[in-house]
């Protein structure tokens, strides 16, 4: 597992690139395999197109960019601004130009041998796909020489994402990462899904862990994280309002009906709360949107159907729709042809730029990342107005809000750790009494 450079010196930096973007392009190209954890609005689209163009100038071969639904159009618009026309969006695997964009869902149409570089836009979205698509992407990426992952800040304590990102880039594997830096509470290896509960960073390995992550990634929430000026990157005000809906249905606990609604503690209880309050929450949402340009972020098909019933002028995005239909609706909303959209954060919460909209209604879940990404569709650089997010939740689900607050604090801590250790060199002391510093075998 080498952690050296696999790339080359950059040959092309767009004239319109800011200094921190130029730095990111140069470092990424030199590295050849890197994860860019840049927050929303920092120009990841421009950076990715520039990376692709550099690979073409160096190799005269093709680069594939994988994107979430409806994001491909944003790449075409950005490329036009940059003066790059050797780019196309392919929906069926046919391509004639050097930079090829496709959706994750359409990857099965493409062959690895046709590409020398691959860029995963919003790579965090992989966790939302079923096993088949995830396996296809992983297998595809591992066969490509130049690999780039691009997404916003990793979820707080989502070490799974960091481990799988490292593995996809060809560095330390997920299980090797666990062995090297983590300790198991139950003294067993456990599964990937419960790492948050079963594993924790070894105290003495914490700084080394974050230094290691920084050997194969770039992370920034603001240009200043990379040593540049924040001028022009100050966000407008974000206002988050909590609307607590009283659950007036009788709740059964251990066979007894409760006069007062107990706080839901388990996933089963939370789902029961969601189900028993869905109409009241939807009614409140319609009241809050009140004819504005807005997005309703819901979680279930039932909620989506009720919202559509109560707001007939809104358009739905649902899983059963064809890819083409979803793209059509999402593009229409982005172009201002649709005023209100009903969708789910796990489906359309990543990659889309909706600065024309500054209001949203959100049904919170345990997922910090889904909420963060959903909010950042509107609250991003280029937004001219204050952004209002109305969270609607039942009185029995307040633990969800508490959990999200805790995860927000952890996200801030994760960002602090990664940026503080950005210049640390990852080394390993063989023994305490041995002053000689040795690189571990995987380097």
Q: Language model features by range: what are they?
A:
Residues 70-93, 171-172:
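Conserved helix-turn-beta segment of the N-terminal RecA-like "Helicase ATP-binding" lobe
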Residues 2-37:
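Conserved pre-motif I regulatory segment
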Residues 31-51:
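Walker A/P-loop
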Residues 45-50, 60-81, 156-161, 300-301:
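Conserved Walker A/P-loop ATP-binding site and its immediately adjacent core
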Residues 366-443:
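A conserved SF2-helicase RecA2
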Residues 226-315, 319:
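Conserved helicase/translocase motor-coupling segment
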Residues 60-62, 81, 117, 125, ...:
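Conserved P-loop NTPase motor "coupling/switch" region that bridges the ATPase
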Residues 295-297, 305-306, 312-348:
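Conserved helicase ATPase core of P-loop NTP-dependent helicases/translocases
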